[in-house]
Regions:
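Thiol/selenol-based redox catalytic cores and closely related redox-interacting motifs
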Residues: 48-114
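Generic recognition of short, well-ordered alpha-helical segments
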Residues: 2-5, 34, 116
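Conserved redox-active cysteine motifs that mediate thiol-disulfide chemistry
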Residues: 1-9, 13
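Short alpha-helix adjacent to the SAM-binding motif of class I
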Residues: 31-38, 56
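Cysteine/selenocysteine-centered motifs that mediate thiol-based redox chemistry or coordinate metal-sulfur cofactors
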Residues: 131-149
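A short, polar/charged loop-to-alpha-helix boundary motif
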Residues: 112-128
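Thiol-based oxidoreductase modules, predominantly thioredoxin-like and allied folds used
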Residues: 15-30, 43-50
């Protein structure tokens, strides 16, 4: 959750650059909503409960059986949070995607403890590749506000 809070801290600057943040989590929607409330996030946290998005980006992996056993021994049952029995997770990733759907920058690391600094994302948003077309700051849709996500 620390990464989401760090992104929340730079959200005003991101919006000034005409961008928005969308987080995608393998957790059930109810957990995503709870995280969003607890951290007072002003951006959407979407659920990828079957890891379909993670698979499409080549980020999904299955934990080796020894790690699954270790997780279970500590009482961490991913199926409770993710809603599926498989011990699969996405690699942490951050993408800068323009309005035409082109990935302008990507940061993916198999080591979940290594995350890009939000300042790096701000710098990527300041590049000419991002500013190929004029943009208006984006706001959360009324539908997402009504759903509480």
């Amino acid at each position: 959750m620390m990464e989401l809070e760090a992104l929340q801290a730079v959200l005003p600057q991101i919006r000034e650059l005409g961008a928005s943040i969308v987080a995608i989590s393998p957790q059930r929607p109810s957990y995503g909503r709870a995280v969003r409330r607890r951290a007072a996030l002003e951006f959407d946290v979407l659920s990828d409960q079957g890891l379909e998005v993670a698979e499409a980006f080549g980020l999904a992996f299955t934990l080796p059986s020894y790690l699954e056993e270790l997780y279970r021994s500590y009482g961490h049952t991913l199926d409770t949070f993710h809603g599926e029995p498989a011990y699969r997770l996405p690699m942490p990733a951050r993408y800068v995607i323009d309005r035409q759907g082109q990935i302008r920058a990507a940061d993916v690391n198999a080591d979940y403890t290594v995350r890009p600094d939000p300042e790096e994302t701000l710098a990527q948003l300041g590049t000419p590749a991002w500013h190929t077309r004029p943009r208006q700051p984006t706001q959360r849709s009324p539908q997402s506000q009504q759903r509480g996500i």
